[in-house]
Amino acid sequence: MPVASPPAGVSAGVLIRSAFAALNEQDVQALRGSWSESIVERFPEVTLHGRDEVAGYFETLFAAVPDFHIEIKALVEQGEEVFVRWRLTGTHSGTPFQGIAPSGRSLASDGVDHLVVRDGMVASNFVVYDQMQFARQIGLLPGDGSAGDRAAKAAFNTRMRLLARLRERRR
């Protein structure tokens, strides 16, 4: 299916606001129309190359979080670069995401995108968000300060002390 290009002459900020609206509509075809063919999208956990990979990522995300919503909290445009601080909410209740079965838990995560627009299309995006917070919210990691969290930290610290002792003995 051909990808429609955004209207000519649209500022980078307007293009990004339009893309965020498409995210909330879960309209992957509209998103494809805002991405360059060779887009590079860097998330903390994966780097995606090209429209097809990025589209696949969002299709999987939308299937995993059917009530996905992302709100722009702040947007700064400087020429071809746009910085967006956002808040994502939803429920991890659909299909598995990145190998993680749906937990039924609510999500509320803040993040920042640094997008570069070239020739009227998103050429790259660097995404930053708190992966530990996300993992705790879906139940992949124990809650901060919980018994499970304290046990995991104690086990890790014990391991580090043992490794330090082994290094000392090898000297």
Please annotate each region the language model reported:
Residues 1-171:
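C-terminal and inter-domain tail/linker signature
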